[in-house]
C-alpha cells in the first residue's frame, strides 16, 4: 500500500506562519487540525513547521510521509455515533532543534513567521539558570524561545512589525504569563540589551490558553484496518474525540489576524489582564 505523501494529498504550498515546539498527538489533532480547516475555509493561509524540542526521538515518520497524516475523530455528534476522517496538510516540515540546529535557527529570520505554538508538557515552562545564550540550543523550552526571539530581534534590527505571538497550550494556569516571566528572567541572566526587552513587551504577544480535547493517539490495534479503509498507509494516524475547546486570553486583540472562529472552529478570545 502506498505511503501517504504530498502527491496523494495535493498539498497546497502556503507561507510558513507557525513554528510549533512539539510534534505529539495532541497538537496534531488539535492545533494543526484546526489550522488545516481554517486554511481550507480561506481564513488563515499559513503552514506550520514542527520542532522536535528534545534530544531523543526521531522525525523519520514525518519525513517519510512529507508531514501529511490523518486525524480520525470518533464520538457522538448530534446524537449519532460518527467517525470523521481528515487528512491534515497544514504541516510543511519537521525539524530537529538539536540534530538540525542551523535549519531550526534560520526560521527566526523568516519574514512570514508570526506564531509560536508549544506543548512541552506541564514541566516544560520552567526557568533554568544553567541555560546559556551560546548553547545550540539552550536546554529548556523558555531558553530555546528566548534565544530564538533574540535572533529574530537582531536579524530584523528590532522592527516592531516582526514580533511573534506566543500560543502555549501547556496544561498549567496562566501558561503565557509564566512563559513570559521565564523569557524575561533569561534576558536579564544573559545581559541582553534593553531594546530587546522593550521589543518583547511591545512587539510580541504572550497569550495564555485553555485547551480541551481528548486525543487517544495512534490506534495501534486498528491501524492496519484503518489504512485499508483509507486506501493508503499512514504511520502517523491520530484519533480523538470530536469535542474541542480553545480559549485564548490575550492582552492585545489578535482575533482578526488569527480568525479561527470565522472558520466555524470552537475557539474563543478573552482579554488578558497582565500582572
Predicted features by range, described:
Residues 1-272:
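Substrate/ligand-engaging "lid" and interaction regions
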